[in-house]
Amino acid sequence: MQQTKKLTHSDITIAVMSGPFLQRGEPALVSKWYRTKMALACGVDLVVELPYAFSTQKAETFANGAISILNALHVSEICFGSEDGQIENFYNTVSAQKNEEETFNRLVKQFMNAGNSYAKATSEAFLHILSSEKNIDMSQPNNILGFQYIKAILMQNSSMQAQTIKRFASHYHDETFNDQHIASATSIRKQLFSENSSFTEIESFIPKATASLLASYKQNYGTLHNWEQYFSFFKYKLMTMSPKDLQHIYEIEEGLEHRILSKIQTSSSFHSFMEALKTKRYTWTRLQRACTHILTNTTKEEIHCANIEQHAPYIRLLGMSQKGQTYLSKNKKKIELPILTHTKTFDHPTLHIERKANSVYFSIMKEPLRTQLLKRDATHHPIRYDETTAKFL
């Protein structure tokens, strides 16, 4: 955040944040409302939600949804972290793919026919068409997402400028901490769910406000969220489904339904299920997203009705600082998408999916807390934060 503000000299900072489930196909550690508080306390001025139909998706769809929301908010500049760290290389890579599109698509198909996952096939295809050092390594997860951000900006004819900050010391999937006080989300999650879990172990790797809110969430609700807590619901659901039922679920393709139903029979945990399920053709993240769609019962028809090839249909406002509120007041007449301060009266296919995802997310809570949280989510107004006093209003 500090580096972004230093690099862009921004007037205000806007964060587009996933809701209950994340792009890598797992539940968010804490609710979006607590994560909104974390973002505001760390200097973000506006926090808006990326709908489930875009957030629990491959990088291309995720990026298209996020950029469309930022475009609607008239953002002038985007900043993202990457392994490469040179924004010119992202533009060069997008240009190279466009110039070699026919060859690229042929190579992707060729590598997939050889049994590789789409992600691996894409990475290999890029290696064949990219010869210059002024291109990015498309095997790296943050580079891939950054590439899709640039591609989305160009495809949506946006005037938005892009900047990138090089990630160092810790990689996206690193599972251990280093001695430079920088940690990946993966390593932090692993620590929080370890047998000897302690918030003190992660305090030097995250902002003080974030650590405090994490501890508060666990104290108030008795849990942090991960896949294992949903496994019994997930397994029961699969036990009641036929292969034909599974075929209707989004991202269940090419006979994957048979493998899923076979492997669930002998799995006693989500991790053991995933270990049994994964193949060379399907990445862990791709399979986790498919499992999330099974858990939330998100069908191909529902995603089709959400029309994800287009822009996000609304902007769900989760939180704002005083500065963010002033920005919205000045620009609301220019913003063409509806801004939702709650979802109680709004209707859209994308929001139908969102409501289901929220219901599932809170399903691990005990009653009456579960019902209270779900009801509150639809009526919850944006969190307001006074940055001058560092207090929530």
UniProtKB/Swiss-Prot annotation:
BP GO terms, sorted: tRNA modification
Reactions accelerated catalytically: cytidine(34) in elongator tRNA(Met) + acetate + ATP = N(4)-acetylcytidine(34) in elongator tRNA(Met) + AMP + diphosphate
Gene Ontology CC: cytoplasm
Location of this chain's protein in the cell: Cytoplasm
Gene3D superfamilies in the cross-refs: HUPs (3.40.50.620)
Binding sites annotated in the UniProt record for ATP: 81, 142, 167
UniProt keyword list: ATP-binding, Cytoplasm, Ligase, Nucleotide-binding, RNA-binding, tRNA processing, tRNA-binding
Keyword tRNA processing: yes
EC number: 6.3.4.-
InterPro entries: Rossmann-like_a/b/a_fold, tRNA(Met)_cyd_acetate_ligase
GO molecular-function terms, A-Z: ATP binding; ligase activity, forming carbon-nitrogen bonds; tRNA binding
PANTHER family from the UniProt entry: TRNA(MET) CYTIDINE ACETATE LIGASE
Family: Belongs to the TmcAL family.
The protein's role, per its UniProt record: Catalyzes the formation of N(4)-acetylcytidine (ac(4)C) at the wobble position of elongator tRNA(Met), using acetate and ATP as substrates. First activates an acetate ion to form acetyladenylate (Ac-AMP) and then transfers the acetyl group to tRNA to form ac(4)C34.
NCBIfam families for this protein: PRK13670.1
Name under which the protein is recorded: tRNA(Met) cytidine acetate ligase
